[in-house]
Amino acid sequence: MMGAEKAEGMEELELEEGGGSPSPSPMTAAGKMQALDFEHIGSLAAVAESLSTGSKWRRALTSVRVVILQAKINVLLPFGPLAVMLHYLSANHQGWVFLFSLIGITPLAERLGYATEQLALYTGPTIGGLLNATFGNATEMIISLYALKNGMIRVVQQSLLGSILSNMLLVLGCAFFAGGLVHPSRDQVFNKASAVVNSGLLLMAVLGLMFPAVLHFTHSEVQYGKSEVSLSRFSSCIMLVAYASYLFFQLKSQRSLYSPIGEQEEEVTEDEEEEKEITQGEAICWLFVLTIWISILSGYLVDAIQGASESLNMPVAFISVILLPIVGNAAEHASAIMFAMKDKLDITLGVAIGSSTQISMFVIPFCVVIGWIMGQQMDLNFQLFETATLFITVLVVAFMLQEGTSNYFKGLMLILCYLIVAASFFVHVDPDSSNNK
């Protein structure tokens, strides 16, 4: 037995010396470890990819919840598809198509303002100002472009005019009234210097609208029907340059002029550091989606204006000046009242008067230039009745703002002025209404 064990030991020794040992070599072990590492890394990559995909889906669902489900006003969203269905099911219900489209656009306009604010949180003040100038009145601009494409020039003029009147009288009046009721023991204060600058721009806009109207109705044109269009196009280019200069003045050159006064500065700084509820890419995607959906509904809305006027027994001027701007200004209306109740009148003025300035100095001239490109005779001749209404409104609001204070009585006066304007357009017969049929 001992001899056999020795023989086996000698054989194992010979195998090891001859290189035929079945034990693993160092190279083979390293290869196995490398393969194991690659498998481990591959499994980690797969897990990471799976987690990333799941995270993207969760992020998308969160974005939908924040933008669509979180706002209570979005209960009105189904009215949009109902308007589209009703348009194709029956041609005899244009009044309902108009009303449903009007209601359906309201939450979209509010959410468009929200997406713009979220995107502005990721940009600097200059780009943020340009975003507000572009998307702040995007609803009015889209409706106007659709009407302009269909040759409904008076609808374009009246809807933009109505948006200015609504912001200056109804939105600002409700904000002053609500703020005064919440703070009844004292007058609320705001930055008078910025209000004076905006009032000057609004008076410049009135100047640009007044001369084509006066030129037309005094029959003092060099070429009847052509000179006012040429003057309007030239004035529109000048107004666009003036608005661009205003943006530079506000955002770069004289930023201190627009800083809040008193104790509002610290509060506004805290509010400006609000949470970024959606990412920059999501904000851009939502801007695109909401703009497309507003564009679709705007087409049905514009097509139904004439039929709605006949079925509802309302003048087209009243629909264009009063009803359409209320939808476009839904976001401004809510935010202006909210900031006034929080005693932040500078933000309220930036929303209400700033929006009026954007429309008068940017949107209206922009529509004239676009109409020029389209071959439409869009001009700044808003007729004497509309131009006089705008002129008186600007004067009233300028007097209200000259002291730099507000209270509930000033707000009440502005609201009552708007009711008078609304009643005036309800009984007003547009001399050019036949052009829009």
Curated annotation (Swiss-Prot):
GO BP terms, alphabetized: calcium ion transmembrane transport; intracellular calcium ion homeostasis
Region (Disordered): 1-29
GO terms, molecular function: calcium:proton antiporter activity
Residue ranges, Cytoplasmic side: 1-65, 110-126, 183-194, 250-281, 332-352, 401-408
Topology of this chain in the membrane: Multi-pass membrane protein
Expression sites by tissue: Expressed in roots and shoots.
Keywords, in A-Z order: Antiport, Calcium, Calcium transport, Ion transport, Membrane, Transmembrane, Transmembrane helix, Transport, Vacuole
Membrane spanning stretches: 66-86, 89-109, 127-147, 162-182, 195-215, 229-249, 282-302, 311-331, 353-373, 380-400, 409-429
Family: Belongs to the Ca(2+):cation antiporter (CaCA) (TC 2.A.19) family. Cation/proton exchanger (CAX) subfamily.
Full protein name: Vacuolar cation/proton exchanger 2
Species annotation: Oryza sativa subsp. japonica
Gene symbol of the encoding locus: CAX2
